[in-house]
Design a protein with these regions (language model features):
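Glycine-centered loop-to-beta-strand initiation motif
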Residues: 1, 72-80, 159-167
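Enriched for extracellular/lumenal, surface-exposed ectodomains of secreted and cell-surface proteins
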Residues: 1-16, 63, 85-106, 150, ...
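Beta-strand-rich structural segments
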Residues: 4, 35-51, 93, 121-137
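Proline-enriched interdomain boundary motifs that mark the N-terminal boundary
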Residues: 23-31, 111-120
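Surface-exposed loops/turns
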Residues: 36-38, 55, 74, 85-86, ...
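Exposed beta-strand and adjacent loop surfaces of beta-rich binding modules
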Residues: 41, 56-60, 88, 128, ...
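Short flexible loop/turn segments that cap and initiate beta-strands
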Residues: 47-67, 134-154
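Short Pro-Gly-centered beta-turn/loop motif in secreted/extracellular proteins
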Residues: 51-52, 81-88, 139, 168-175
Length: 186
């Protein structure tokens, strides 16, 4: 609180009380860990310095080099669906509006839903290709049909209880690219 004294004509001195409130915007953004095509979203909050939501303000979320403009809702929150390939990304959130400015950084990690290792096979030996399949929540994809493509030929195999599928490899010597398809998220 400040006491403000003023005079307009040197004969009369007036006084008023001036109240100064804290001013500023505070962003919050948490790290996100999700599986490919999972339902999790990148969420932010925008509040004033007293923790009250700031409503209807533009917030910029930059992820993977792309800016997304979101508007804070009645709770001061906004979110962005994460539809990125598996990998690690840095999300930068910024606000510059009527309530000041703030910025935050958060990490977004998208996990694979298929895992397998390169193999080296000697012609006609017993080495085979195995891959593990999981759903978008990280649970094994048990007893499901999955598809492999190698050398332009598609093969359908069923996973076991742990989400593993095996593909027998019987090809001439050479280098091949094998593509596995998860039926849950393509």
């Amino acid at each position: 609180q400040f006491d403000l004294y003023h005079s307009l004509d040197n004969n009369f001195v007036g006084s008023d009380k001036l109240f100064a409130n804290d001013y500023g915007a505070v962003l919050c953004a948490d790290d996100v860990n999700k599986y490919y095509r999972g339902p999790e979203r990148f969420s932010i909050c925008l509040k004033d310095v007293n923790g009250n939501p700031i409503v209807g303000e533009n917030v910029i979320i930059n992820i993977n080099g792309v800016d997304y403009k979101k508007v804070s809702d009645d709770k001061g929150t906004a979110s962005l669906a994460i539809n990125l390939d598996s990998g690690e990304y840095l999300a930068k959130v910024s606000y510059n509006g009527r309530f000041g400015s703030d910025s935050k950084k958060a990490n977004v990690k998208v996990y694979e839903t298929i895992s397998g290792n390169d193999i080296v096979k000697m012609f006609r030996n017993e080495t085979q290709f195995y891959a593990k399949f999981i759903d978008s929540s990280g649970n094994p994809l048990a007893k499901r049909a999955v598809t492999f493509n190698i050398n332009g030929v598609f093969y359908t195999r069923n996973t076991d209880d742990s989400g593993y599928a095996k593909l027998n490899i019987n090809l001439r010597p050479g280098t091949y690219i094998l593509t596995a398809y998860n039926p849950v998220n393509n």
